[in-house]
Amino acid sequence: MSSRARHSIAAVLTLALALAGCSGGSGSPAGDETRAPAVRGEAAPTAGSPFWVDPQSDAARQVEQWQSQGRTEDAKVLKRISERPVADWPAGDDPVPDIRRAVKGAAGKRTVVLVAYNIPHRDCGLYSAGGARDGQAYLDWINSFADAIGDARALVILEPDAVSHLVDGCTPAEYQGERNQLLSEAVDRLKRQPGTKVYLDAGNPAWIKEPSKIAEPLRTAGVARADGFSLNVSNFQTDEAVKAFGTQLSGLLDGAHFTVDTSRNGEGPLSGEGDESWCNPPGRSLGTPPTAETGDALVDAFLWIKRPGDSDGPCRGGPSAGTWWPDYALGLARRAGA
């Protein structure tokens, strides 16, 4: 799973010269932005949520394990994650089993939240490098992804990083035209499913700082035919900072709506830690719980897209990107209840 907060421009240039890829900026919160409301107390009941909660998630299995080991207090705290809906990131080789399991679990009563993350040349060769081997393989994957959703209610976050890496120059010029075409075709294919909403990822306000720089690339990638764009995926920017950025960007995109990843932004971003402040930063906490009741006409949902407790990569003692890290998860949950 990709980490969406990224290096400074200077670091990007250095990496580019070394042909080692590049990434978006993590940045520090500007001024005295209001901190996103954190989760307090026990996990909220799931009955009022429109989104599916996976009873077999890593967090849920960890709760069971700790309960069996007598770590009852830690298990209770971790329920702040396990009892809330988080996104599913279907496998890059075959997305069908993951999606079908989620759709079956939702049983037509909940919306499954999915992340399509398999674009060729993904993450510019960094911690979450990979993706489909070529354009046709990607289109085949997207077709299987969409077929597996069927008529179910689904919300799809389409290709975190992909457009932002076009804007920051990370994606080499020879791949840019293909990427735009693939994203556009992916939007159209997913929107053929009657119950599917699609949000094309647009990075975060500490990465692409000026909304005007990403508006036209989003248009080229097909955002007008999607349901909107997504912000803050796997990042830590506050709700207020993200909503302000999203509102400006929406104004450049004919009033497009957007979603916000609030999975780990309860304390905002880590400042003063250089280029990898985005990678497994200490002292963070869960943010606003997933909901479609956002209180903002432009914000369709607050979502936990980055699965709280999954590592950003092998930094600060973490495992590889996307790997469950129970100690980090426990810290996020515990600080949310402080």
Where in this protein do the model-derived segments appear?
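Secretory targeting and sorting signals
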Residues: M1-S28
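C-terminal region of N-terminal signal peptides and the immediate post-cleavage residues
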Residues: L19-A43
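N-terminal carbohydrate-binding/catalytic regions of secreted carbohydrate-active enzymes
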Residues: T46-A148, A152, R307-A336
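Surface-exposed substrate-engagement region within the catalytic domains
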Residues: D54-S82, P205-A329
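Second-shell loop/turn segments in exported
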Residues: D88-D93, A102, L126-G135, D168-G177, ...
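Sec-exported extracytoplasmic/periplasmic mature domains
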Residues: K104-G108, D147-G150, V187-G195, E216-V223, ...
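Structural preference for beta-strand elements that scaffold enzyme active sites
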Residues: K109-V113, R153-I157, G195-Y199, A226-S230, ...
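Active-site cleft segment of glycoside hydrolase catalytic domains centered on the general acid/base Glu
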Residues: G131-D151, P160-T196, G203, I208-S212
